[in-house]
Amino acid sequence: VFTEVMVSTDDQEIAEIAQRYGTKVPFMRSPEMSSDMAMTAPVLIEVMNKYKELGKVFEQLCCIYPTAPFISAQRLNQAMTLLISEKVDGVLPIVQYSYPPQRCLLMRENRAKMLYPENYNVRSQDLEPIYHDCGQFYCLRTDSLFAEQKLFCQNTLPIVIPESEAQDIDNEEDWKMAEIKFRMLRGEQTR
């Protein structure tokens, strides 16, 4: 589904590992795009500009996050197919919140307060489902990325995935949850 797979990094060790497994690292990421505060859209714009300098132009791109262990080839193929066939700016996987955010609470002066008190007497199952980006991948038209300078473009199509396929890994607890989901997806007993 992809004509080229590359890793964007500023770390030589990561670059060497990526290349050992057959991934291209045609250039290193700039220091400006390597800080903990760097956002993904500017990194992708830098990557596309560097490719253009090398004489390569891509009409579409797909950014895959390394912290998302349950991405499948089928989902990536589905997303790229939708991106092209539906003529949208982007496609991203989303997952329904496990509990309705309309019933969320804020802490004010050491007290719990409903953010949306009008939903106090509404059953959670009667509230409209709300979804969030599950942080796995973004498939985009390159011209839309450049025009809008963001990952979530105006005309973005979602792919709703089950909670069992969504797990971002940012800390040790996330890792443990990923292990549980992995065993569950493989049909193994969880401990």
Please report, for each region that a protein language model flagged, where it lies by residue.
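Short phosphate-binding loop-to-helix
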Residues: 6, 12-60, 70-78
